[in-house]
A protein has these predicted regions:
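Short, structured segments at the rim of ligand-binding sites
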Residues: 2-460
Length: 460
């Protein structure tokens, strides 16, 4: 069941609601204007929500800064509030105060109603097992870009000593005594499973060792938060994370790292529209793989202390061969926005998606807009991946440049939705992009930012 903005109204998260104007859920985009100007990106969606969950583990208040006003933050705020955490958010300052001193069990029906379209609820397991000895986790939402199983998560929790009971509408978990540290190797360096293990191990008894862990910058920032809270965690260079469990954790004060997915999305928009955009809050170190690719395609950038400027230098863009991967590779979430820019590159580009098996569904609408994109089951252009033998259309060949023309399109998922905005901005004529509230999940004030960059957009 998906939560609507109304669902949050009784909670103290009003400023997070964002667009609730009652207007139609669509944006008209008059394409053809190069994006130009300066915008700011705040904290990373895929870190902020996890740090908020981590606050549950502390005995004292936490303060998180640089928090964007996006729907995923509202969903997590709602769930934390239901469990007795006092949440106060100031959208203008981007500061969220979290007081977990009165944590309590929530009613199943309410949890279900507040889970929204997010995957974050699964990360409540460890903290709730430590705080309350039990947890109910509703069926998860999230973007339809693959099957997105949670088998690694459940295996981790079972090994720590939790009883996992799948019920209609969700999963009930119970701690059989104090959770105990484990030694485990992930079959794949999953971001969520690594976070699950971290949030559970920090207060489990004894040592936990995870091999083949994900080491995304958002995970490292979560580890920094947990260390501030009193955890003992080391990260080795070979994807091994070791955690010494402690009895108590306190609150934290932390400033979230910037959203490198949002930054790369705007950079791709600058490239696809022939524009010039400076992104405050974008940082080189977390975006190195993207910057290399941006340069290979023919885009230019300039790194400054507080921002990165991205622009199209004029002339043709170059086709590339690209493979998505876990960090430090090219992020899967950068793929969809960049593919739109690749429709404007000369020659054949090959993109091999190795993180999600179904992340090219969004290309249907791009084809409708004039792009020439073919999808293949084979692993093209790189080493075979785990999807190669499984019949998934996970490689794309993009032939360009092709002029894009306006169309009426429906947002399929968060990043695919932003890609449609980029395509509509690059296209000739007036496009209608429907279902834009999905984009609110991860892009703060995107309409205002579009307008600030000179885009001709209006709500339906
Ligand atoms: N996987 C399993 N079993 C599991 C968990 C994962 O097979 O129990 C598989 C997935 O099906 C997928 C792969 O492992 O094929 C990677 O999934 P991962 O667990 O790393 O992804 P996630 O934690 O569900 C987060 C982000 C995604 C981002 C990925 C990869 C959040 C809330 N989501 O998802 O972000 O694409 O890591 O970096 O942090 C987005 O922001 O639009 C988004 C989809």
């Amino acid at each position: 069941m998906n939560a609507t903005p109304q669902d949050y109204r009784h909670l103290d998260v009003g400023p997070l609601l964002g667009n609730d104007s009652g207007m139609n859920d669509l944006l008209y985009v008059n394409g053809g204007n190069p994006l130009s100007g300066t915008i700011t990106v705040r904290g990373a969606k895929n870190f902020v929500s996890k740090a908020m969950v981590a606050s549950l583990l502390g005995e004292t208040k936490s303060v998180l800064r640089n928090v964007p006003q996006i729907r995923d933050v509202a969903v997590v705020s709602g769930l934390l509030s239901l469990h007795g955490v006092q949440v106060e958010y100031s959208a203008a300052d981007g500061v969220i105060n979290l007081d977990p001193s009165a944590v309590e069990s929530a009613h199943v029906a309410e949890i279900d109603a507040h889970a929204g379209s997010s995957r974050i609820p699964i990360l409540f397991c460890g903290p709730l097992l430590h705080r309350l000895g039990e947890a109910f986790i509703p069926d998860l939402g999230g973007c339809h870009i693959g099957d997105r199983p949670i088998d690694f998560h459940l295996e981790i929790l079972r090994r720590f000593g939790a009883e996992v009971d799948k019920r209609e509408g969700g999963i009930h978990l119970r701690a059989l005594g104090r959770l105990k540290g484990i030694k485990m190797e992930l079959p794949y360096p999953s971001v969520g499973a690594t976070e699950q293990l971290l949030l559970t191990a920090v207060r489990a008894e004894g040592i936990t060792e995870l091999s083949n862990a994900a080491i995304e910058p958002e995970i490292v920032d979560l580890i920094c938060v947990l260390q501030k809270m009193g955890a003992i965690i080391s990260v080795d260079t070979d994807r091994v994370i070791r955690i010494e469990g402690v009895d108590r954790l306190t609150g934290f004060t932390h400033t979230a790292l910037g959203d490198r997915i949002e930054a790369a999305s705007w950079a791709s928009a600058a490239l696809a529209t022939g524009g010039d955009v400076t992104i405050k809050g974008a940082h080189q170190v977390e975006m190195m793989a993207f910057l290399n690719t941006f340069r290979k395609v023919g885009g230019q950038f300039e790194v400054h202390d507080q921002d990165i400027r991205f622009w199209h230098p004029g002339g043709p863009l170059r086709s590339i061969v690209l493979e998505t991967d876990v960090h430090p590779g090219f992020m899967t979430d950068w793929q969809q926005p960049l593919v739109v820019a690749l429709t404007q590159a000369t020659g054949l580009s090959i993109v091999h998606e190795t993180v999600y098996e179904k992340r090219f569904g969004f290309t249907c609408a791009l084809r409708k807009m004039g792009a020439n994109i073919q999808i293949y089951r084979e692993c093209l252009g790189g080493a075979p991946c785990r999807f190669g033998q499984r019949n998934f259309h996970h490689s794309a060949v993009i032939s360009g440049p092709t002029p894009l023309h306006a169309a009426d399109v429906e947002v399929p998922d968060l990043r695919g939705g932003f890609s449609y905005l980029i395509a509509a901005l690059a296209a000739n004529g007036r496009s209608t992009v429907r279902g834009i509230s999905l984009i609110d999940r991860g892009y703060e004030a995107f309409q205002e930012k579009l307008e600030a960059l000179g885009a001709d957009v209006s709500r339906g």
